[in-house]
């Protein structure tokens, strides 16, 4: 067992214990998060429009903040996109994640410095919970494929724009960088078919132990792997 796998087991147990403490008091845990979010956003335009200063309970929130879709929030989003501050969240976001827009065109989701860690930690913690439950940590010594959109970002009004998976690529922990595949150059390829073939070419003879990404992407890469011969 390697030092890395031993460390992974120790860290996994720590994260599991933290999650268990939250799970044992779910209402209290969620209410603390609720209060923190309301307090942080009460001076924003959205917070003022919806009387966040008066919201003390979940019932207050239901009365003041109606359920709505993206189009109903688009006016706020457009203000943030051109650099206005304190609209949906304090200050302005560091990123905008652009979705494919399957229903009504592209959608832009703001990502703040407070929210970015949750995107990384959620994936990390899923793996750590698996390690804690099974005791299997040997896979951390193998290569790991992260199927992502292009990490190349554009910038407007001090905010960077890109695909969510491409944005998250900038936040892969240092301790995973050595095991990470494909290469940065391959991740930057826009054409999907070319990208898949390049990924397979880079990884087919490696000891791959983890693959992550949108299920359809994982399926495509896995199928392509199966159709190509490996080196003897």
Where are the regions that the model predicts?
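A short, hydrophobic C-terminal helix/tail in secreted or cell-surface proteins
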Residues: 227-232
